[in-house]
Amino acid sequence: MLCENAAQSNDYFEFIGEYSGVLDYVKEEFNTECITVIDQRFAIAYVKKNGRTSIYGQNYPYNTIPRCFGLMDTQMLEDVGVAQVRRSTLDLYGNGVLVGMIDTGIDYEHPAFRYEDGSSKIYSLWDQTIEGDPEDTFLGYGTEYTKEQIEEALKSDVPQQKVPSKDESGHGTFLAGLIAGNEDNETGFSGIAPNTGLIVVKLRKAKDYLKEYYCIDPKYEAYAETDIMLAVHYIDHIAEQLQRPIVIFLGIGTNLASHLGTGPLDQYLSGRAMLRGVAVVTSAGNEGQARHHYSGQVSQNDAKVEVKVGESEYGFAMELWGLAPNRYYVDIESPSGQKTGRIQGGLSGQRYVTFLLEKTRLIVEYFTVDTSAGAPVIVMRFQNPAPGIWNIYVSDDGVGNREFDLWLPITNFISEDTFFLESTPYNTLVAPSNTGLLISCGSYNSSTGSLAIDSSRGFPRNAVKPDFTAPGVEILGPLPRKRYGRKSGTSVSGAITAGIAALMLEWGIMQKNDMQINTTRIKNYLIRGARRDPERIYPNREWGYGQVDLYETFLGIR
């Protein structure tokens, strides 16, 4: 197998390496010459499996193993102040701006994605799922389709024969439509920035070995951190070629993270967010009522955490994050009463436990210092977990702050019958939305004015998040096969915010009102203009700084 085929081959493991300009560091760390450079900090290393089926027990740093991300499920123009802006002299429709979509693809045949002259709004489409010639693609796998190829397909009687890319789930199509969809007189729909151009990446599903590592049921759709980082790299590349300002939008997330914005994807996006003419927008997540977060503190006795596991749960991974310089230990008790005993280790290590009565296999990995967050982390992976109550007894060395957090996977990776019996709805923003430099948006119901019940809540330990909220309940948008329908979730409110960010880039860069505009400046403009309830204290763990309102933002600028 040639090295350039490593990205599409199942014969390789993938790792994320940091090299600080010296690529030999990555080659030496992973003992491979197969490297894809993302930027001056990150690269992806492809390591031949050589008969190995799993990365268990291979002693790679935890932050080098790609995380798995999932989708954030999914009279709006008036609610966010866009209709008022259109009625003003600002004339903002997204002209000259691009939006990069990293999701499930797009129905490029939908009329919502064609300009008035019939040309496509999609400037480039990279479908990671369609195998092509590695030499013909920018990053060595998948297939790229240009604007010209898409428009040629649209002229055909059978467009799919020329550009065979589909959005099977409709998630990406819906979000792209909220951002850039045309006005539809029959349904009354209009995207936020209908003149915006699109760069679309359809993510391929994570490789089997990675889903196995995180104990994710094969029936769930998961996406690898490496593919997402390369998608961002691709969007940057196309935007640079076209010399256009760009919004990068991600309607995906994960719970398995430090929740401090320290993961490779988090840091890579932070670097993009600081650039002039770039806005990075994320969805806060739908974990507010999922009962997937436990926050506790070790006192004189061990802290006891109860996890209820549902029937027929395939498996799951759970992470414990503590605070340095403390060292944490776990003792895990099965529903039948079998205990692992106190699991402890040195700098890092693994322990395998089989529960005989339950036929459950447990793999515990511990890292005294996580490379990226600098904090202790214990990763517990349950294979074929028995239903019932599992007890996690947490102890520590009693040094410094003795607080800790436990997170179960996101809703889309685990059944609704598996949760913490005592949980907290706070600090539930998914990665990368808990990253300080990015724009993070929660969700509210514009019909009732209330917070969406599932909207993830703040605050992370080191940031005020979410930044604000946007409508995200029963919102109208385009669906595959030229249809329209309604969806809910913070990916919806995030897409609305991404459209608003595109209008801000048009105002700043294309209309030359703020030539230094970037993610931070857009965020601060929108925070100043957010509507706030006088009965609430801000910043607020549920609402951030309020409800986003573009018109009020411009009233505050004048």
Protein language model features and the residues they cover:
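Hydrolase catalytic cores
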Residues: 176-179, 188, 199-209, 236-246, ...
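Autoinhibitory propeptides
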Residues: 2-98, 105-121, 388-390, 419, ...
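Short acidic, glycine-rich surface-loop motifs adjacent to enzyme active sites
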Residues: 63-68, 230-260, 283, 397
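Noncatalytic modules at the cell exterior or secretory-pathway interfaces
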Residues: 315-316, 382-398
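Catalytic cores of secreted or luminal carbohydrate-active enzymes
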Residues: 247-248, 265-295, 548-550
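Extracellular S/T/G-rich loop segment that most often corresponds to the catalytic His/Ser-adjacent loop
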Residues: 126-128, 132-135, 139-148, 290-376, ...
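Edge beta-strands of jelly-roll/beta-sandwich modules across compartments, strongly enriched
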Residues: 399-411
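Subtilisin-like serine protease catalytic core
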Residues: 87-224, 314, 325-326, 435-437, ...
